[in-house]
Each structure stands twice: as structure tokens, then as C-alpha cells.
């Protein structure tokens, strides 16, 4: 790059010796120290040794300088000021440097990067064939035309493109992308030199089939006004914005332009969720908010009503507590109605009350919660911890990527009952439903314990089954389910009589009267 620069250089993304930065200033600066290598020849015993040392030489030649803010602040030397004059500002006190323009790489356009990576060079021939083609109405003689056509054909077939770390700075020619590679469906543009969301739009607007877009590690300026043009991202299903500096407000502002988006990755952006999505992100099924400081559970509640959200990744967000205010003990929350898979790795979860709350999620089937104080090996036997989590979350099918087999669940729930059986009795628990009155403290600590006492390896089975009346069963279920006795209707099914349901219509009769046996299934309706 020459010392002559255009006026719009400020804000551009650049690369210097593999390190990325943003230009914050261009102009004349008084003498500035530059880092140069220097050599010293040391003759010793007839052998010439060459030592290469790094030293700062303060030799300044007047001219243009660029003030840059490095992505890696350890790469810089100052905060954008020099000898008391502030030329630009940095977020970090050592994030800035002054660099000569000829040391800086401003990158290449999208098509140049595509051709550099994907065009296969033909084997050199002794003599290129001469060919005549018609352009307009005139015949034109060409040399090497076959090679050009072949290259264009290669690019037009591309559907998945990876241009990671290829110094892409923008779209280039206005319609060039649409003409050369119109069939691209997936692009990895991570760690490039894109400066703004407008740069992204200029590329995406030419790719009408674009479904997957990865923009990670591009420090982008997002619009403060109007949302994305309608139609630009009409097919986009996956968008990755990890480490782009995007804010939650900017996400919501742009999201109206993502009408069919299903997966959104926002890792490591210092995001604070400040408002509830209104009429945007309603199609999102997966949301990754990892490595953003979302310690306050109230931030999460702002996204709790996204209707299609099935997977939520919250690794390393610093969260330690959780309470769904709309659901009491043994009840399900209305929040996160479709959530099936939750990732909570690398957080500060240390209390079992957090796990208890997860049982309130009505659709949760899979959980990852590795590397938390509660689950760290050494804090408690790892297998016991796994058993307790399984017992506390009744609908869980997968824990830390390991499928929970039926045998494992039965064993976990049995061991959990045994582990806290004495505590249950001391708290007022009793096998006789009329005497079963565990205190609120126990129920809060073990919300599922009462229901586990009802179950055995095959459906519902009561240890006192032979003497229990239908009325007693209803009384027990009324307290457990918090439903009026008068609203409960009981019946059962037996493997011995497939397809037949028998109603328990006489409250005064015992279950033995109806010939209920171990292995039968008690049905409860209200």
C-alpha cells in the first residue's frame, strides 16, 4: 500500500503480519518509534556469527501514518496518544500503534479471494490455442478463451465456500458475484477484513440461495437506523456472528431481515440482553449465547417466549442461580415452551436448587452441565452426581451427551430414594397417604421425591396396594398434583387385557377389589 490513501481509510479493517486491526487514524504524526530488525556480524575464531536482534530505532521520515487499534491489545504500544496528543482512542491502554501504510494489507474483494482459492490453474501448454468468438455482431480472435470458460464453469458450480482468513474486504464489482458464482449456499467468511454490515449485505444481496453465513471474528459496524433490505437474507437459515462485537440491540434491529433464520450464534460479544424480541427471531430453533456475561437470570427470561426455540447454548455465561417465578413445586413453567436441549457447561452452578428448577421445563430432554462446581469430579462422586441429576429431572433422556437408558433411570431413581429416605421420614414423610405430610423445606429441596415414592420399575405400584382404597388414592394424588379430589377420575390398564381400560368407580373399594397387580398402569384424569 502506498503512502497515498483515500479519505475513507478510517474504519477499514487491515492485516499486518498475520494480526488484525482497525484503522482509527490517518495523517501526519511527529517522530514515532518503529520496530526494525538489525544484524550484527561478530567474527570469532575465524567463524562469522550473525545475530538477529530486535530493537526500536527512532528514525522518523516525515510522511503519512496509520493509527490502528489491534484486535489483540497485547500487540499494541499505547492508547492512541503520542507525546500528549490524542490521535485516536482505544478500548485498551496498549491497544494502539502507528504504522506506515506500506506495511498494511487492506485485503482483496470477494471474487478475487474466490478465484485465488478455487480456480484450478491449467497445466502450461507450449502454445495457447487461438479461437474466434462472437461478441455483439463482431468476430473476435482470442487466446486462452477455453481456460477462462473453464474457470467460470468451476465457480458457477460452487455451493459451499470457505474463505476463512483470506483478507476479504468487500464485494468488489457490483454484480460480479451474481454473474460468476450465483449458486453459493454456504459461506465461511470468518476472520476476514469486512468492516461493516453494509459490506456483508453487498455480498449477500448477490447470492439469492444463501442459507449459511459465518462472519465470526470480523469486527463489524452494524447499522444504527434502518434494518437490512427486504429479500437480502430471504433464504438464510444459519448465521454465525461469534466475536463480531454485535450488541443485542443491533441483533434485534437487523433480525427483521432474517425471516426464516433457524440457528443464530452470538458467542463472545459482551452481549447484555436488554429487551424482549418483538416480532423477530420467532423462527429461531437454536440460539448460542456462550461466553457473554448473562449472570442475571432476568436477562434469560427476556428470550423465554421464543416459540420455536429448541436448543439454547449458555456455556460460560457466569450464571449460578435460576428460579422460574411462574411455577411452584412440582409444576411446569410456561417459559421456554419448546426447549429440548440446554447447554450450561463452564458456569458457576453449585446448588441442587438450580437442577430442581430445570425439571420445570416442560420439553427438556437433553442437558449438558459439565465443569460446574456441582458436577466437578472431586466435589462429589461423579456417578452419584449423575444419578441425582437424572432422578431430579424426570423427562431427561440425555445427560452430558450420554443417553440415559431405562435401566440407568430406574437405578438412579431408586438410589436417590434410598439416599434421602431417612430425611424424608424425619421431615414428615410416611407410606400411609393419610399420614404423609413432608414439610415445605423437604419438598423444596426434593420436588420429585413424592412422585418417585409412587413409582417402581413398571408403572404405578403402591407398596400398600392391597389395603388402599380408591378414595385414599385420590386423596394422595390430590395433594401431589394439587387438584381437587372431586375432579380426579381413575382407571387402569392391564397387560393381561390389552386394549381394555377399567374405571375405578367405587371410592370405597380397595384396589385389590379391582384385581390391580404389579405391572398394571394407573391412569389419572382431571
List each language-model region with its residue ranges:
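Short coil-to-beta-strand transition motifs
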Residues: 13-20, 61
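Long, contiguous C-terminal flanking segments immediately downstream of a protein's structured core
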Residues: 2-9, 17, 92, 101-526
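Short, acidic/hydrophobic/Gly-rich beta-strand patch recurrent on exposed beta strands
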Residues: 67-69, 491
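A short macromolecule-binding patch
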Residues: 74-102
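Acidic glycine-/aspartate-rich tracts in secreted/extracellular proteins
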Residues: 29, 71-76
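Short, solvent-exposed secondary-structure boundary/capping segments
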Residues: 30-46, 58-67
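Short beta-strand-centered aromatic/proline hotspots
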Residues: 19-30, 44, 50-58
Amino acid at each position: 500500500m502506498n503512502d497515498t490513501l483515500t479519505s475513507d481509510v478510517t474504519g477499514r479493517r487491515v492485516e499486518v503480519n498475520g494480526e488484525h486491526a482497525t484503522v482509527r487514524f490517518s495523517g501526519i504524526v511527529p517522530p514515532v518509534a518503529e520496530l526494525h530488525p538489525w544484524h550484527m556480524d561478530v567474527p570469532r575464531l575465524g567463524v562469522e556469527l550473525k545475530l538477529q536482534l530486535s530493537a526500536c530505532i527512532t528514525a522518523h521520515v516525515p510522511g503519512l501514518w496509520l493509527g490502528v487499534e489491534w484486535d489483540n491489545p497485547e500487540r499494541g504500544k499505547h492508547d492512541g496518544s503520542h507525546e500528549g496528543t490524542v490521535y485516536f482512542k482505544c478500548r485498551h491502554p496498549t491497544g494502539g500503534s502507528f504504522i506506515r501504510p506500506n506495511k498494511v494489507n487492506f485485503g482483496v474483494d470477494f471474487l478475487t479471494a474466490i478465484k485465488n482459492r478455487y480456480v484450478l490453474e491449467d497445466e502450461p501448454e507450449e502454445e495457447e490455442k487461438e479461437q474466434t468468438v462472437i461478441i455483439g455482431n463482431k468476430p473476435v480472435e482470442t487466446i486462452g478463451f477455453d481456460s477462462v470458460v473453464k474457470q467460470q464453469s468451476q465457480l458457477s458450480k460452487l455451493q459451499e465456500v470457505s474463505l476463512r482468513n483470506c483478507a476479504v474486504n468487500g464485494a468488489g464489482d457490483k454484480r460480479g458475484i451474481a454473474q460468476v458464482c450465483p449458486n453459493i449456499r454456504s459461506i465461511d467468511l470468518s476472520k476476514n477484513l469486512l468492516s461493516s454490515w453494509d459490506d456483508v449485505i453487498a455480498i449477500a444481496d448477490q447470492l439469492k440461495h444463501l442459507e449459511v453465513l459465518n462472519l465470526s471474528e470480523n469486527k463489524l459496524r452494524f447499522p444504527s437506523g434502518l434494518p437490512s433490505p427486504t429479500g437480502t437474507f430471504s433464504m438464510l437459515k444459519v448465521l454465525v456472528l461469534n466475536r463480531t462485537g454485535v450488541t443485542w440491540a443491533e441483533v434485534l434491529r437487523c433480525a427483521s431481515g432474517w425471516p426464516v433464520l433457524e440457528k443464530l450464534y452470538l458467542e463472545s460479544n459482551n452481549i447484555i440482553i436488554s429487551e424482549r424480541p418483538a416480532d423477530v427471531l420467532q423462527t429461531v430453533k437454536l440460539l448460542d449465547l456462550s461466553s457473554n456475561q448473562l449472570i442475571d437470570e432476568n436477562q434469560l427470561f427476556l428470550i423465554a417466549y421464543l416459540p420455536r426455540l429448541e436448543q439454547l447454548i449458555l456455556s460460560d455465561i457466569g450464571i449460578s442461580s435460576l428460579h422460574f417465578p411462574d411455577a411452584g413445586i412440582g409444576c411446569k413453567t410456561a417459559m421456554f415452551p419448546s426447549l429440548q436441549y440446554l447447554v450450561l457447561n463452564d458456569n458457576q452452578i453449585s446448588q441442587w436448587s438450580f437442577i430442581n428448577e430445570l425439571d420445570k421445563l416442560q420439553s427438556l430432554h437433553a442437558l449438558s452441565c459439565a465443569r460446574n462446581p456441582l458436577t466437578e469430579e472431586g466435589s462429589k462422586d461423579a456417578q452419584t452426581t449423575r444419578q441425582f441429576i437424572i432422578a431430579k429431572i424426570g423427562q431427561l433422556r440425555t445427560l452430558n451427551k450420554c443417553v440415559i437408558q431405562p435401566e440407568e433411570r430406574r437405578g438412579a431413581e431408586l438410589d436417590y430414594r434410598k439416599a434421602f429416605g431417612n430425611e424424608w421420614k424425619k421431615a414428615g414423610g410416611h407410606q400411609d397417604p393419610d399420614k404423609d405430610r413432608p414439610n415445605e423445606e423437604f419438598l423444596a429441596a426434593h420436588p420429585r421425591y413424592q412422585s418417585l415414592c409412587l413409582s417402581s420399575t413398571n408403572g404405578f405400584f403402591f407398596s400398600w396396594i392391597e389395603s388402599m382404597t380408591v378414595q385414599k388414592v385420590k386423596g394422595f394424588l390430590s395433594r401431589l398434583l394439587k387438584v381437587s379430589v372431586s375432579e380426579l377420575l381413575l382407571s387402569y390398564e392391564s397387560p393381561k387385557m390389552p386394549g381394555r381400560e377399567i374405571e375405578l368407580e367405587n371410592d370405597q373399594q380397595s384396589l385389590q377389589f379391582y384385581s390391580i397387580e404389579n405391572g398394571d398402569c394407573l391412569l389419572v384424569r382431571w
